[in-house]
């Protein structure tokens, strides 16, 4: 049968939780404290960057359900810092190191929010 969720340790020593379906919570919080960050820079040319992306509605192939969002390949051109990748394994896979899977792009939408904030700031100028 299909998995409900799995966790894996990535080769860069980060961890990923994959959920087959929707996740519901009151909040999903990311670390954002200035004290945790180095090399802080305002996003330059935010308006030009956002114009490299479109907002889309689409149907997800794996479940046929409608969604809205961005395309990772466009985000990669606009602001590569928000694009990552993950592995998708076949049903029944153990996720063991070296096991075959399909790599696909992911988008950190909170990073896209940072870009949108800066677009609004640029429109004030």
Q: Could you say what each language-model-derived stretch is?
A:
Residues 1-4, 14-16:
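Structural detector of coil-to-beta-strand junctions
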Residues 4-6, 117:
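Ordered hydrophobic segments in well-structured contexts
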Residues 9, 13-109:
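C-terminal intramolecular chaperone/autoprocessing and neck/assembly modules of extracellular spikes
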Residues 102-125:
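Long, leucine- and charge-enriched amphipathic alpha-helices
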